[in-house]
Curated annotation (Swiss-Prot):
Renumbered residue ranges of the record's region Shielding domain: 211-318
UniProt-listed CDD domains: M14_ASPA
Catalytic activity: an N-acyl-aromatic L-alpha-amino acid + H2O = an aromatic L-alpha-amino acid + a carboxylate; an N-acetyl-L-cysteine-S-conjugate + H2O = an S-substituted L-cysteine + acetate
Keywords linked to the UniProt accession: Cell membrane, Cytoplasm, Host-virus interaction, Hydrolase, Membrane, Metal-binding, Zinc
Protein name per UniProt: N-acyl-aromatic-L-amino acid amidohydrolase (carboxylate-forming)
Entry binding sites for substrate: 63, 70-71, 178, 288
Region ranges (Hydrolytic domain): 1-210
Cofactor note: Binds 1 zinc ion per subunit.
GO CC annotations, alphabetized: apical plasma membrane; cytosol; extracellular exosome
Species of provenance: Homo sapiens
Domain of life from the UniProt record: Eukaryota
Molecular-function GO term, any one: metal ion binding
Length: 319
């Protein structure tokens, strides 16, 4: 496996971003809180910077104003010539790229943690680009070991040859927290508290790394996308059925060929006609209706994450 280089210096420039989607309220309110009371984000070797990523969408309690911000951090958006007619989120992505990046540069932030909620029953989902992200994989493993009761699942979103497009990709290292189920525009105390605890543990892990802790190699299980499935539709494009009760809320559970996936309004069931077992995620996600996605199909796979050696202390200045 070809892995990205492991950081060889302490991670000093760290950001926690909330409100990338303006109606995912755990991150919105945590970011707002930390902007006024940032002490919770301080550690001995660094202080994380809180960022409210999409202020306009947040003020309107909308996912986005003109364009999904978390799909906007590609070179085509970031490097194109600005115009007065640019969508709000394209302009905001460029601003965030200047603040936290520039993407793929030596000046970029060392780590960005991006906070999200989902209406799907994803539980505690850890989202990274790929298995090659060694620091992120060790962080995911640390969270799994710290909170076995949460069954933290790892979702690796980037397909082969695809450019990374989400907010945390502007940093040298990044991770997304995706917690649910929580309705859009609603703040649940349990989800809020869980996210707050996870953020603290992420920062604690970075502090461990900065202080010279070594992390051994390990085997990791994760999920990667292999396709998407739309709802059944009429000729006019309206829904003709919805997610079957036997599939609803079964994110990360195996879906076997022949199992029901949709219940038609006419009464019959539609069955999964694939040839192999898949693991659906983001099942019946509210934000994906407009994208024509009833659920994302993933495959489960196992891979080896190489060891992350301890940082070598910087030499003391000559006296």
């Amino acid at each position: 496996m070809c892995s990205l280089p492991v950081p060889r210096e302490p991670l000093r420039r760290v950001a926690v971003t909330g409100g990338t989607h303006g109606n995912e309220m755990s991150g919105v309110y945590l970011a707002r809180h930390w902007l006024h009371a940032p002490a919770e984000l301080q550690r001995a070797s660094f202080s994380a910077v809180p960022v409210l990523a999409n202020p306009a969408a947040t003020s309107g309690c909308r996912r986005y104003v003109d364009h999904d911000l978390n799909r906007t951090f590609t070179s085509s958006f970031l490097n194109s010539r600005p115009t007065p007619d640019d969508p709000y989120e394209v302009t905001r992505a460029r601003e965030l790229n200047q603040l936290l990046g520039p993407k793929a540069s030596g000046q970029a932030f060392d780590f960005v943690l991006d906070l999200h909620n989902t209406t799907a029953n994803m539980g505690t989902c850890l989202i990274a680009k790929s298995s090659h992200e060694v620091f992120a994989m060790h962080l995911c493993r640390h969270l799994q070991l710290q909170y076995p009761e949460l069954s933290c699942q790892v979702f690796l979103y980037q397909r082969s040859g695809e450019e990374s497009y989400n907010l945390d990709s502007v940093a040298k290292n990044g991770l997304g927290l995706e917690l649910g189920p929580q309705p859009q525009g609603v703040l649940r105390a349990d989800i809020f508290s869980r996210m707050r605890t996870l953020v603290a543990t992420v920062l604690d892990f970075i502090e461990l790394f900065n202080q010279g802790t070594a992390f051994p190699a390990f085997e990791m299980e994760a999920y990667r996308p292999v396709g998407v499935v739309d709802f059944p539709r009429t000729e006019a494009g309206h829904l003709a059925g919805t997610v079957h009760p036997q599939l609803q809320d079964r994110d990360f559970q195996p879906l076997q060929p022949g199992a029901p996936i949709f219940q038609m309004f006419s009464g019959e069931d539609l069955l999964y006609e694939g040839e192999s077992t898949v693991y659906p995620v983001f099942i019946n996600e509210a934000a994906y209706y407009e994208k024509g996605v009833a659920f994302v199909q993933t495959e489960k796979f196992t891979f080896t994450v190489p060891a992350m050696p301890a940082l070598t202390p910087a030499p003391s200045p000559a006296s």
